[in-house]
Amino acid sequence: MNSFDKTSDFIDQVIHRLYEKNRHDRIFSKDAAHSSTTSSVLFLLGMHCQETDFSNLPCLILNKRSLKVKQPGDLCCPGGSISSRVDAFLSKLLYLPGSPLTRWPYWQLWHKQRRTEARDLALLFATCLREGFEEMCLNPLGLKFLGPLPQQQLIMFQKVIYPMVCWINRQKRFSPNWEVEKVVYIPFQDLLNPSLYARYRLNIKTSKDNENHPDIRDYPCFIQHSKHSTEILWGATFRITMVFLEIVFGFTPPDIKSLPVLSGSLDENYLTGNG
């Protein structure tokens, strides 16, 4: 992170690396805009590490899911499924001058040379902007769009996630709704530290049938320590984060077989949100 002493250098590096990654690849599947399995999320970056001592370094900003939703306690990016009518209307507003999308340096190129994908990009970006506002009162006009990340497939749910990388310019306070327990800030300085990764060994108790035959699975994870709590980043959000770190910094986490074991469990409430 020492090579990014200036915020502008960090942002420019992210924009450039994402564009180079995406310039020759198709980002969205052909039915992405119409599939019920499609979700889009905001991969939020900013300088607001309020719970750490690294307030002047770039951070990843995530939501911690509340006990009232599926996957309670997990760290996630704000976002969700497409609301056809609402998001179609909002996507048209993103074509207006001064929007986060039209301020993106490569928008005009996409709009001219990749028109279908540009339309899908606008729709999916509108979706996660709306969800970000609903979940944490994120100001969509205060974001700088840096580019899309490759899609991710959820393992336990039939969902395809399209992450949109954004920089939060000025907003420092958020107001989470009932879906969100709190906002979590992870400095990239920590994410680039191999010693903070572990092997998350989960005992998955999704029914009484497997009590005598436990379903034990290992997942790579990142452990975030703060003054008030310890958070575990794993699953789809972990994979999205690792893709970002590899594209932008050339960083890959240690092999899972070499990592210390951290034990945990999931019960049937994990899939229903009835905790």
Residues covered by each model-derived region:
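Amphipathic alpha-helical interface segments
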Residues: 183
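N-terminal leader/linker segments that precede catalytic domains of diphosphate-processing enzymes
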Residues: 1-180, 188-275
